[in-house]
Design a protein with these regions (language model features):
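Short histidine
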Residues: 105-196
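Short, surface-exposed acidic/glycine-rich loop or hinge patches that mediate macromolecular interfaces
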Residues: 78-79, 103
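Short beta->alpha connector loops at strand-helix junctions that form conserved
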Residues: 99-100
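C-terminal helical cap(s) of enzyme catalytic domains, especially alpha/beta-barrels
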Residues: 21-41, 103-126
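Alpha/beta enzyme core
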Residues: 1-74, 80-95, 142-172, 179-186
Length: 196
């Protein structure tokens, strides 16, 4: 994508099908599916590629933000519902494309997907796609940073628990002189004195 943008491209799409081999028949020892006993790597598509497509869209959208503002990204790869489309948009896609989903469910599925996307938008009170495009990008970081944040949280929890335990074990201040008796606190002070 970077090379395409450097070359003057105004937009890219991600991802197409992933070249794949479905299997090898262990009886015939031939790859499958076969045509006249032979095969060729084909395109792996549908919802199985969605996690890969989402990662690629996130990475490209992040690059566009920092290096090529104003360029566009169309997300595709496993979109079968409006919720799927929303995920691509949240990760920075400007538009989405559907192929395998329509092949599986028919052209009428496009209206369903649009209705589902609109329901998502209404739920979150988004009026336009721009209101949420790329909104999830700010929540990505490095593995190192995740470990640091988790360690920091655990250290704070441990310190708070130790402070609470120390407060629970600390001796209660006893009344040492008549002048320390309080009218409002007399019952509590008496109980504390009796318990030792």
């Amino acid at each position: 994508s970077r090379a395409a943008f450097r070359g003057g491209c105004q937009g890219v799409s991600a991802i197409n099908t992933i070249r794949s081999i479905m299997s090898v028949n262990l009886d015939t020892l031939r790859p499958e599916p076969t045509v006249e006993g032979f095969t060729t790597p084909g395109g792996y598509s549908g919802k199985a590629v969605r996690p890969i497509a989402l990662r690629m869209v996130m990475e490209i959208a992040t690059m566009i933000r920092s290096e090529f503002p104003g360029r566009s990204l169309s997300g595709l790869g496993g979109i079968e519902s409006g919720e799927d489309a929303a995920q691509f948009l949240l990760l920075g896609a400007d538009t989405v494309q559907v192929c395998t989903g329509v092949m599986k469910f028919g052209y009428e599925s496009v209206k369903r997907m649009c209705d589902e996307l609109l329901a998502f938008m209404e739920k979150h009170k988004f009026e336009t796609l721009e209101d949420f495009k790329g909104k999830s990008l700010d929540y990505f970081t490095t593995h190192r940073e995740l470990v640091r944040m988790q360690g920091e949280r655990k250290a704070k929890e441990k310190a708070a628990a130790a402070e609470k335990a120390a407060a629970a074990e600390a001796p209660k201040k006893m009344v040492a002189a008549d002048s320390e008796w309080s009218g409002d606190e007399f019952v509590k002070q008496s109980d504390a004195l009796a318990r030792g």
